[in-house]
Curated annotation (Swiss-Prot):
Superkingdom in the source lineage: Archaea
Keywords of this entry: Cell membrane, Electron transport, Membrane, Oxidoreductase, Transmembrane, Transmembrane helix, Transport
Gene3D superfamilies in UniProt: Formate dehydrogenase/DMSO reductase domain
Membrane topology: Multi-pass membrane protein
Protein name, UniProt field: Hdr-like menaquinol oxidoreductase integral membrane subunit
Function comment: Has menaquinol-oxidizing activity. HmeB subunit may function as a menaquinol-oxidizing site. HmeA, HmeB and HmeE subunits may together catalyze electron transfer from menaquinol to cytochrome c.
InterPro entries cross-referenced by the UniProt entry: Electron_transfer_protein, NrfD-like
GO molecular function, one term: oxidoreductase activity
């Protein structure tokens, strides 16, 4: 039996109230950016030029890549029962990459600076390549979604494969921004690109699980728990892989004598916010969601699976914070083996970074914008199937 996708009517008071709330939060986020841009209302400094808004860039790209890979399960891996989620996942992937590109725009400040990536393209710079990868990734997402709307089976399979390949390439490039920085002890790691990919799939899938639950519930459409259970098991398995990557990277750095102080600062200093961002991710973002999914009492309950997905996705943002901030606040060792007694700058000392309310509002505003795009999209486009059950597949 073929999958039948339909728009929602979207004529209820609750629908319009949700649109207004999301639009207001989005506008508040952009207003916070204007104030920050004019008056510098942030916690950044010369030592910490990348803050929480910058942490949103790899986070949003990861959510996009994760959603897109889930969307391609039917086309690439021939798991036809997940075709019912292919459109909604691809649409969310496009929405999240828009948020990522806007995060970059907020960081750049002046939009015409985007042209510099073309005018002064540097083939040896990962930043130059990422400018091409991100923009082309959005185009691929859009074409992939379009061929799904047109029911072009061969083109859909081809675009699904290309989308997965490009999603892996994009997130590897994002991870390479940090892992290729050899001078920063807490950045340089060959494990960062593959860890980024796994983290992208888990966070994207976790948030998609919650998105599916709430969408089908509030549109009063049938959602088979077996389908969600299958995705939840994939989700749990990949979280275990992510935990393994984090453990290996931590142990690798811990065994390097030169990194002893840096490792102690990140993993064993409770007075540091970086310490909490890491351990909260491990305990509440990985361990607890895995227990929820694998526990027979909670693993079949859509509400618990939704909670696990939201918990993991939220704390992956803490992982992005843990990745970006420590490499900046911890000092570089300019002369290994020597102690610098006189410094006229903050170089050589651990500095602090606390995100301002205006930085948080920018991130929250971008998230609200993504869900505004989604809420309007389900009214304008046929993204959601009438019913999502295992029997409703394309033969």
């Amino acid at each position: 039996m073929a999958v039948e996708f339909k728009k929602i009517e979207g004529d209820s008071i609750q629908y319009f109230a949700l649109v207004i709330i999301l639009a207001a939060v989005t506008a508040l986020g952009f207003y916070a950016y204007v104030l920050d841009h004019k008056m510098g209302l942030n916690g950044l400094s010369n030592r910490v030029p990348w803050g929480i808004v910058n942490a949103g860039i790899p986070y949003f790209i990861g959510l996009s890549a994760g959603s897109l890979i889930v969307s391609a399960l039917a086309g690439v891996f021939n798991i036809k029962k997940y075709k019912v989620f292919s459109r909604i996942a691809a649409y969310m992937a496009a929405a999240w990459i828009i948020a990522a590109i806007l995060s970059i725009a907020l960081d750049i400040g002046k939009l015409y600076h985007f042209m510099n990536a073309v005018r002064y393209f540097n083939p040896t710079s990962i930043f130059s390549w990422n400018a091409f990868l991100y923009s082309s990734y959005f185009v691929i997402c859009s074409i992939y979604l379009l061929v799904q709307f047109e029911e072009m089976e061969k083109a859909t399979r081809f675009m699904a494969g290309l989308a997965v390949f490009w999603a892996v390439l994009v997130h590897s490039g994002t991870g390479a921004i940090y892992s290729f920085v050899y001078s920063k002890e807490l950045y340089h790691s060959a494990l960062t690109p593959p860890m980024f990919i796994v983290c992208a799939i888990t966070s994207g899938l976790g948030l998609l699980l919650a998105n599916l639950y709430f969408t089908f519930r509030f549109t009063k459409r049938e959602l088979d728990p077996k389908l969600i259970r299958g995705l939840a098991l994939i989700f749990a398995g990949l979280m275990m892989v992510l935990g393994y990557f984090l453990a290996v990277e931590g142990l690798e750095k811990g065994y390097i004598p030169a990194l002893h102080e840096a490792v102690q600062f990140v993993f064993l200093t409770p007075t540091s916010g970086v310490f909490w961002s890491f351990w909260l991710l491990v305990i509440f973002g990985i361990a607890i969601p895995i227990i929820i999914v694998l526990n027979p009492k909670t693993g079949y309950d859509l509400r618990w699976i939704t909670f696990a997905g939201i918990l993991h996705a939220a704390l992956v943002f803490a992982e992005r914070f843990y990745l970006i901030i420590p490499g900046q606040v911890f000092p570089e060792e300019y002369l290994p083996g020597y102690e610098l007694e006189s410094l006229h700058t903050l170089e050589g000392y651990i500095v602090s970074y606390t995100p301002s309310v205006f930085e948080w509002l920018q991130v929250i505003g971008l998230i609200a914008m993504v869900y505004l795009i989604f809420v309007v999209g389900v009214k304008l486009f046929a993204l959601i199937p009438e019913r999502a059950v295992e029997e409703v597949v394309e033969e």
